[in-house]
Amino acid sequence: MGQGLWRVARNHHLQQEAYSETGYLSREQSRRVASSNISHTSHRKQAQGGIDIYHLLKARKSKEQEGFINLEMLPPELSFTILSYLNATDLCLASCVWQDLANDELLWQGLCKSTWGHCSIYNKNPPLGFSFRKLYMQLDEGSLTFNANPEEGVSYFMSKGILDDSPKEIAKFIFCTRTLNWKKLRIYLDERRDVLDDLVTLHNFRNQFLPNALREFFRHIHAPEERGEYLETLITKFSHRFCACNPDLMRELGLSPDAVYVLCYSLILLSIDLTSPHVKNKMSKREFIRNTRRAAQNISEDFVGHLYDNIYLIGHVAA
């Protein structure tokens, strides 16, 4: 009886082992087949990748043999962006490569108006044969001439029909241009007070704090290096323009153009005192308030104190 049970158990165990071995063999065979397929696929991809790399290297080699990449294949938007950073000389060189783009009128029009914001010719019907590329060259040439001799520069602009012979048109041109030498411009404005008058009226100081407005004014119209009649003229014109732009504030503070004139001179002197390394004993806030109110008695003490703080924190008004 016991031996019979032992035989049954042994046969059952052997059957399980045989089943397990058979399953293992089938699974192992499947794994090997799959591995073989993956290896074959990988080998095929590697071969394909090798072919792609070969073609890329071959194409690159052929490009190198031909020379530079054809820049005309770039998108127009990218080409316009690149060309917008070039000056006239570089654009002429680029025209050898980008013939169509370098001669594009919209590009040259943008370059002209971004550098010279106002010209009389912009508002006229273009003459026969007009091009913004040619205009850019003339504006560049005229600016260089102005920086050598202001009168000759303005005469050049007028002879080319770029500017009208009008103080207002010349003032607008100067106001919207940043390529003119400020020293030559100062000499020109000192001689052409009619242009200076129109240039001052182009400034808008509405709702600006007095020292900040004075800084903006002197950024466009540079102050002379020494005191004199021209500096007095600039401050006088600024004072009247500042009051005209802020009538409500002037009534509220009780200020007149003469009072603003005094404040401007005080701000210039304070700027020199606080920023000059040669002045060891700097003017205190109390001293500035006392001296300023002595010259203009109707000015608020708090307002004068704010003026001092502005110069102390921000710096010179005519730097």
UniProtKB/Swiss-Prot annotation:
A single cellular component GO annotation: ubiquitin ligase complex
Statement: the UniProt record of this protein carries the keyword Membrane: no
Superkingdom: Eukaryota
Disulfides per UniProt: none
GO molecular function: guanyl-nucleotide exchange factor activity
SMART domains to which the protein is assigned, alphabetical: Sec7 (SM00222)
Tissue specificity: High expression in brain, heart, kidney, liver, lung, skeletal muscle, testis, and day-7 embryos.
Function: May promote guanine-nucleotide exchange on an ARF. Promotes the activation of ARF through replacement of GDP with GTP (Potential).
Name of the protein: F-box only protein 8
PANTHER family documented for this protein: F-BOX ONLY PROTEIN 8, GUANYL-NUCLEOTIDE EXCHANGE FACTOR
Gene this chain is encoded by: Fbxo8
Short name of any one Pfam family annotated for the protein: F-box-like
Alphabetical UniProt keywords: Guanine-nucleotide releasing factor
Claim: Membrane is one of the keywords in the record: no
